[in-house]
Amino acid sequence: MLDIKQIRENPQLVQERLNSRSGKYDIEPILQLDRQQRELEGTRSQLQARSNEIGKIVGQKIKSGINSQDPEIQALRDEGNSVKATLSELEPQEKDLKAQIAQLVLALPNLPSDSTPLGKNEEDNVEVRRWGDEYIPQNPNILPHWEIGEKLGILNVERAVKVAQSRFVALVGAGAALERALIQFMLTLHTQAGYLEVSPPLLVNTESLTATGQLPKFAEESFKCADDDLWLIPTAEVPVTNLYRGEILAAEDLPIYHCAFTPCFRREAGSYGRDMRGLIRLHQFNKVEMVKFVEPSTSFDELEKLVGNAEAILQALRLPYRVVNLSTGDLGFASTKTYDLEVWLPSSGKYREISSCSNTIDFQARRADIRFKEAGKKGTQFVHTLNGSGLAVGRTMAAILENYQQPDGTVKIPEALQPYLGREVL
């Protein structure tokens, strides 16, 4: 959530930053309501001061011996009652204005950082670096991962669709074992890098989704329970970030690093007809997530480290990838700066997103009211939160099935993964 003070004091800058994003955002209604609310607050403050003054004057006069029924005292009391009646009318009006402002501010995305490239969409994303070109397979006859998966008997779409619907898959035998090995491998590398593993709830309440920015704007993209205020998580970022919602952390405990493996659930409402086959775009998929809580002065350095932690997985698996800095037109709602890691999929000859690493600065912390306090200092500050995939497990499987495909129709297991799987080939 943006700071209303920032909107009030720098309206032109805020509007310009919002205009650089995709979508249309107008802060003028917020500014108008804010002016009304502050005027009302000023009036209420003056009336409250007058009410206090009247009470003090009446008390002094009675103390000095003037009869409480004296016309002057009675007039003061009548004025005091009138002031209190007006105050009681203004209070709900001010409360309503604050609620309206809060709802409008909740609908605004984060402001892009100065180091986020200007652009209209993903075409304007800026490539930062590539890694592993020497590992790009030269075999011209590589099958798409869903075809080789079905040939090997490790991927069954037809039966999964029978059980659920389209955009679901069932992993069988060595496929299920490969997924389990990848999850263990990723968590091991992250915990070795200093992340504390957590196993969070897979269902969260509305307040949690609002805190991380999925609600109210993206309700149609999530699965909601019909009879409860619970939603299936779209990413572990939501429950892990909300573990600290409403808390004041000690500065000496920062930074806090967490990693978590969870299934994730997304309706993919805006993706009709895209990536209908395979493991790329599913309603249910597994992912290992990294989440950080850090001091504001360190958050952009922490973003670079976060990207490095995700890259370490791809490098250990010898999977070719590139890092791109997302443009303002492709930036996620809660993020001020995002790097996407895109893995090479030879069957399509394209790089595809496998990780998204974002710095939300104080945007989520402000919505979730997560603060920290330095010892010996007054007041608190909002922490900065970061999150990143480390990695999307299904997409990592897809990349292995294609990049490690052999001419004889088998798939070699990456050397780093072999101890976790107990085999060298599928």
Swiss-Prot record:
The keyword rRNA-binding does not apply. Its EC number is 6.1.1.11. PROSITE patterns: AA_TRNA_LIGASE_II (PS50862). GO terms for molecular function: ATP binding; serine-tRNA ligase activity. Gene3D superfamilies: Bira Bifunctional Protein, Domain 2, Serine-tRNA synthetase, tRNA binding domain. GO terms for cellular component: cytoplasm. Keywords: Aminoacyl-tRNA synthetase, ATP-binding, Cytoplasm, Ligase, Nucleotide-binding, Protein biosynthesis. Transmembrane segments: none annotated. SUPFAM superfamilies: Class II aaRS and biotin synthetases, tRNA-binding arm. It is found in: Cytoplasm. Pathway: Aminoacyl-tRNA biosynthesis; selenocysteinyl-tRNA(Sec) biosynthesis; L-seryl-tRNA(Sec) from L-serine and tRNA(Sec): step 1/1. It catalyses: tRNA(Ser) + L-serine + ATP = L-seryl-tRNA(Ser) + AMP + diphosphate + H(+); tRNA(Sec) + L-serine + ATP = L-seryl-tRNA(Sec) + AMP + diphosphate + H(+). Pfam families: Seryl_tRNA_N (PF02403), tRNA-synt_2b (PF00587). InterPro entries: aa-tRNA-synt_IIb, aa-tRNA-synth_II, aa-tRNA-synth_II/BPL/LPL, Ser-tRNA-ligase_type_1, Ser-tRNA-synth_1_N, SerRS_1_N_sf, SerRS_core, tRNA-bd_arm. ATP binds at R266, R267, E268, E353, I354, S355, S356. GO terms for biological process: selenocysteine biosynthetic process; seryl-tRNA aminoacylation. It comes from the Bacteria. Consists of two distinct domains, a catalytic core and a N-terminal extension that is involved in tRNA binding. Catalyzes the attachment of serine to tRNA(Ser). Is also able to aminoacylate tRNA(Sec) with serine, to form the misacylated tRNA L-seryl-tRNA(Sec), which will be further converted into selenocysteinyl-tRNA(Sec). Belongs to the class-II aminoacyl-tRNA synthetase family. Type-1 seryl-tRNA synthetase subfamily. Homodimer. The tRNA molecule binds across the dimer. This is Serine--tRNA ligase. It comes from Nostoc punctiforme (strain ATCC 29133 / PCC 73102). The lineage of its organism: Bacteria, Bacillati, Cyanobacteriota, Cyanophyceae, Nostocales. The gene is serS.
